């Protein structure tokens, strides 16, 4: 596909997940042990796009290059990747696109580094062509999400409000909850489109197909900083001007297109996609292999709907359900792991129980400890028989844990 460029945004800091992004940039956060950005890169490559620009902070460029090479994605999907280094001053996505507009020379498929899906984006691109759209935003009502560990909150609701012309899918309004603080004014759109559905059913996946000519106009706009909060609403409003040729659409991701889709920009969605994407993992990231398999009769280890890396050591009589265990972990005998993410180099003692938790790099959990619905930050220690529940465990908090 030579008429479009892929734009992959990897410069964001991950402010909604500070306990995880304090030690690693969001684009490098591991999802089933693989840096997050490789998933949207795979999506672009599977679409057939051969010209991809990756916007990244300069200090991370070499790391991203190494991870791309290691992934062998370019061996399967040949493409040219250009890394564009951005500065701290490029605060919003629109700022970034404006400041580097000379690098964008075609219609573009813009994808955030936290878009994780096994779905094909080819139907979206086909829709973009067929409708001669100015902008097409990918939306989905099946984005995986869950309450974040470390809290007692209920399952989060969708956070985007949008108005869609039911007959065509044309977008008449789009706003995220962070920006939804003003009265909703839709007089112009209702005059043109009398049948509009206002809904919060869908998530904006932060995947946009957009015409090059409007990106050129963006480069001349001094007062636009955010792509979604500023530029997309501007384009939507311009549809209603006399003689306007601008058309903005929402493309609903069909349920039959893929098994898993996530906009993993929160702790809850990040946590859940680590578990959900495992069913498609070996197809998306072939270079990682199949991981460890166990025969309960001979190994005395029960592992269900889980991925365990080859370098992990699991002792007998352990039970692992819908979890991920990363490289160089040591799991003691008679441990129970359920609905949890175990990062690199974690040591878990005999008889410990971990449920619905994220255990970060280098954590040590003592024998017979019980960790439920928690995030245990990098290099923390939970003592033997320690019990911690609904907590974010960081530096200086170990003295508060109970020893039952």
Swiss-Prot record:
Q: Is the keyword Transcription regulation in the record?
A: no
- Alphabetical list of SUPFAM superfamilies matching this protein: Nucleotide-diphospho-sugar transferases, Trimeric LpxA-like enzymes
For this chain's UniProt record, which GO biological process terms are given? Answer: cytoplasmic translational initiation
* Subcellular compartments: Cytoplasm, Cytosol
The record ties this protein, via InterPro entries, to: eIF2B_gamma, NTP_transferase_dom, Nucleotide-diphossugar_trans, Trimer_LpxA-like_sf
- List, alphabetically, the GO terms of the cellular component aspect: cytoplasm; cytosol; eukaryotic translation initiation factor 2B complex; guanyl-nucleotide exchange factor complex
Subunit text: Component of the translation initiation factor 2B (eIF2B) complex which is a heterodecamer of two sets of five different subunits: alpha, beta, gamma, delta and epsilon. Subunits alpha, beta and delta comprise a regulatory subcomplex and subunits epsilon and gamma comprise a catalytic subcomplex. Within the complex, the hexameric regulatory complex resides at the center, with the two heterodimeric catalytic subcomplexes bound on opposite sides.
Homology family: Belongs to the eIF-2B gamma/epsilon subunits family.
- Protein's name in the database: Translation initiation factor eIF2B subunit gamma
Q: Which organism is it from?
A: Caenorhabditis elegans
Q: Which gene is annotated as encoding this protein in its UniProt record?
A: eif-2Bgamma
């Amino acid at each position: 596909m030579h008429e479009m460029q892929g734009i992959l945004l990897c410069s964001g800091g991950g402010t909604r997940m500070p306990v995880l992004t304090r030690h690693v940039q969001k684009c490098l956060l591991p999802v089933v042990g693989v840096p997050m950005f490789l998933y949207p890169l795979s999506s672009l490559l599977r679409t057939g796009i051969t010209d991809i620009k990756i916007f990244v902070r300069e200090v991370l460029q070499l790391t991203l290059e190494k991870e791309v090479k290691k992934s062998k994605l370019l061996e399967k999907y040949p493409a040219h990747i250009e890394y564009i280094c951005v500065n701290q001053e490029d605060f919003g996505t629109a700022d970034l696109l404006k400041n580097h507009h000379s690098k964008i020379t075609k219609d573009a498929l813009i994808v955030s580094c936290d878009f994780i899906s096994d779905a094909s984006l080819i139907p979206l691109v086909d829709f973009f062509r067929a409708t001669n759209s100015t902008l097409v935003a990918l939306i989905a009502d099946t984005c995986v999400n869950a309450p974040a560990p470390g809290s007692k909150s209920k399952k989060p609701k969708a956070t985007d409000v949008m108005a869609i012309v039911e007959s065509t899918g044309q977008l008449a309004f789009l706003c995220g909850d962070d920006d939804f603080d003003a009265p909703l004014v839709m007089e112009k759109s209702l005059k043109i489109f009398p049948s509009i559905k206002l809904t919060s059913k869908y998530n904006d996946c932060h995947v946009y197909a957009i015409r090059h000519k409007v990106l050129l106009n963006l480069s001349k706009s001094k007062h636009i900083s955010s792509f979604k909060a500023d530029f997309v609403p501007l384009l939507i409003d311009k549809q209603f001007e006399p003689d306007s040729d601008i058309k903005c659409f929402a493309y609903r991701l069909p349920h039959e297109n893929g098994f898993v889709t996530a906009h993993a920009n929160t702790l809850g969605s990040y946590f859940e996609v680590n578990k959900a994407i495992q069913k498609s993992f070996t197809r998306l990231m072939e270079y990682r292999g199949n991981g460890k398999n166990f025969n309960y009769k001979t190994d005395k280890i029960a592992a269900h709907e889980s991925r365990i890396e080859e370098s992990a050591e699991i002792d007998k009589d352990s039970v692992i359900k819908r979890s991920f265990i990363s490289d160089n972990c040591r799991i003691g005998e008679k441990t129970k792991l359920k609905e949890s993410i175990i990062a690199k180099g974690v040591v878990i003692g005999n008889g410990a129980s971990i449920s619905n938790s994220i255990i970060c790099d280098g954590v040590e959990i003592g024998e017979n400890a019980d960790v439920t619905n928690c995030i245990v930050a990098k290099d923390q220690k939970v003592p033997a028989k320690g019990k911690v529940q609904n907590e974010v465990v960081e530096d200086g908090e170990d003295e508060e844990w109970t020893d039952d």
